[in-house]
């Protein structure tokens, strides 16, 4: 089944038949030792921290997929108002949350 996903509150030309509630995917990641060392050096001299960017992108993708799986478990075929949020966990971890409202179209 194809999952339609939007950051908006509706799908153009579609009628939302039922709202099933909030769905989410949560991932907590921390950098490897080498990523931490490279990130520390980059923070001193400035510039893009590629290892951190890659880690964050993977965490976002994993959280996104977990949100879709949560919606599929509810037999949803759409997710509206999809958002990402992040936060720090302790001194070394980053939480990535992907959430939205599962719907039947």
Curated annotation (Swiss-Prot):
Signal peptide limits: none
Superkingdom, natural source: Bacteria
One Pfam family here: YbjQ_1
Similarity-based family: Belongs to the UPF0145 family.
Family annotation (PANTHER family): UPF0145 PROTEIN SCO3412, UPF0145 PROTEIN YBJQ
Protein name listed in UniProt: UPF0145 protein lpp0255
């Amino acid at each position: 089944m194809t999952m339609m996903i939007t950051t908006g509150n509706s799908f153009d030309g579609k009628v939302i038949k039922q709202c099933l509630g909030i769905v989410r995917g949560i991932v907590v990641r921390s950098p490897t030792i080498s990523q931490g060392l490279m990130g520390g050096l980059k923070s001193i001299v400035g510039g893009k921290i590629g290892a951190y960017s890659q880690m964050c992108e993977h965490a976002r993708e994993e959280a996104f997929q977990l949100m879709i799986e949560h919606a599929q478990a509810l037999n949803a075929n759409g997710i509206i108002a999809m958002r990402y949020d992040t936060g720090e966990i302790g001194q070394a971890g980053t939480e990535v949350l992907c959430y939205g409202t599962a719907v039947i179209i």
